[in-house]
Amino acid sequence: MQKIGIGLAGLGTVGTGVYRSLLQNNLLLTERVGLELEVRRIAVRNLSAPRKVQPPPAILSDRWETVVDDPNVGIVVELIGGIDLPYELFQRALKARKPVITGNKALLAEKGAEIFELAADVNVPVFFEAAVAGGIPIIKSIREGFIGNHLQSIHAILNGTSNYILSRMTEAGIDFPEALQEAQANGYAEADPTLDVNGWDAAHKAIILASLAYGFWVDSRLVYVEGIEHVSAADIRFAHDLGYRIKLVATIRADSNSSVEVRVNPTLVPQGHVLASVNGVFNALMVRGDIVGDTLFYGRGAGQDPTASAVISDLAQAAIWIDSGGKAFGFTPHGLYGKCLPTDELVSGFYLRLTVDDRPGVLAQVAGILGTHDIGISSMIQPEGHDAAAVPLVLMIHNAPFGRMRTAVEEIKRLACVKGPPILLWILS
């Protein structure tokens, strides 16, 4: 039976899970794939650091180049993180005609076009199931399972940390700082949670999904990204009273002109929608195709074992490609869809919360500004029980282009009767 050598660049949390799982399920993999997979080289940052697994010292190195250049390594697994160094690894490995597996969403979001152009030139596959939604096989599903569908939309919860925080804010009525502190104490948020809570972790994943779905590599500068830091317990409560839950949602969809919308932002999700019931650290994706209709994917989107599972799935596919040859696959560009819609042209309903003076005429001033921008109010709540001179005013806005809505909010903010910054959230449609 043919043996195929694996090189791991990185032995951190995910790398450790991959190495352990390969040892644990080696016989199962061999029987299912018909090939024997063997780790032959591992690159680590510090050779003397303590580890939860103990590979043979002879296969360890503190230089990633030894993984790529080893003639006994046929598949390279990039688990280093970052952009510049992994990009260099990709170039070197692909030019050596070695398939590369990665879970590096930031790298693919920023350098995907260049990576896949090189991969196509040398006819070597790139695998990246672990880059989006952990153990949920969404990449394979879009690339293969839905290959005969025009994908009309993807709505997804793609970041477990932000979803945990919003879930705790909903369940316990606490504000963002307290929920974040709880997430960190329970190991669901990093010491530096910036990319999780500012929306960019989910945005990197959304860029990858949109690029696969629509056949052109999406420029991150054209993606609207907003985090959850400004969402308050009051917004959670008001949204609930209106029949919604607030989630950080990635919205990816094509319009009738074949233009593509890609955004990530806190979104009011109707309580009856399936995404509204996705709580804690779980991820979920609802994919709508013109033939298949609605499909739902749900599971753990991060963590050692779910991510390792995705990497091992890719290892099996890479080994089969080496054994059988054929055309490499990864990302196939095409011209069926034209461009990303500019942010200001994106259309949605909106939730607008203002803090205003408690006196007659305030609503008329706000509605007047909205009206001058051809923006309509669908409903309004003004919660009672506030003794202060300033009170909350919550407006639900009919569908409108974001550019017009943003301009109107800037004008409303300058009214003397408005106290504090307005809160504007999108509504799932």
Task: Label each region the model flagged.
Residues 85-96, 103-143:
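Rossmann-fold NAD(P)-binding glycine/threonine-rich loop
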Residues 310, 315-429:
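A conserved regulatory-domain signal marking ACT and ACT-like small-molecule sensing domains
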Residues 100-101, 377:
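A short hydrophobic/small-residue beta-strand
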Residues 1-95:
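N-terminal glycine-/serine-/threonine-rich beta1-alpha1-beta2 phosphate-ribose binding loop
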Residues 178-277, 282-284:
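Substrate-binding/catalytic subdomain of NAD(P)-dependent oxidoreductase enzymes
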Residues 293-295, 299-305:
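Glycine-rich phosphate/pyrophosphate-binding beta-alpha loops
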